[in-house]
Amino acid sequence: EKHPRAKRIQGVKGRTQAYHAAAMMSDTDYFFAVFPTIDIDDSFDFTFQPDRMKNACHYIFHAKNPVNGLEYGHRSAILYNKWLCILTINPGLDFTLSQPHTVVSKLCGTSHFNQTPEISWRVAFREVLKLCEMKPTVESKHRLKKWCELGKGQYADLVQRGALDAVEYYKEVDGDKDALHLSYELSWLKEKFNSIS
């Protein structure tokens, strides 16, 4: 087995509850969280150590998006601080970004999130809402543009559709935080997807 210390978590209801359950499984102050859709590069170093001289934070690595070619922290491996994770009770739109975090510009692998129509749409919808909500930068504008273009590969049309639907929804609710936060729940996203498909 490639990663003998890896622990699998499944069957937990709720996004925040899943993060908390993963944190509680950790025997150390930091733990890596890896989505099952990430194809981890053999060269990725799981022995990365947090900077103990800094305040506690989460470390976000880069992952490649096979649909639009972007490489950044979206759906990447993340080294979570166990205690910050547990203390995140009412996160914002993004659980990880709700606490101090640092980006580590090292590629961990490729995130093959585009495996079903619903997940392809949902992942794009959520990510584009986050990009719409953040203060615009040259980088965030570029990412938003790439998400909204037709990419390549399986369900590329639904990835684009999810992105465009998110831009439309953001405008429709005028960036209202409560309306945006509805997308945190999988049941709401499922209903939204079913209403457009």
Predicted regions and their residues:
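Short, solvent-exposed coil/turn elements at secondary-structure transition points
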Residues: 12, 37, 64-66
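Catalytic-site signature of metal-activated, phosphate-bearing donor transferases
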Residues: 47-197
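Short, surface-exposed beta-edge/turn micro-motifs
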Residues: 28-29, 75
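Short beta-strand-to-loop acidic/aromatic patch adjacent to the donor-nucleotide binding site
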Residues: 22, 29-42
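N-terminal anchoring/stem segment of glycosyltransferases
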Residues: 1-27
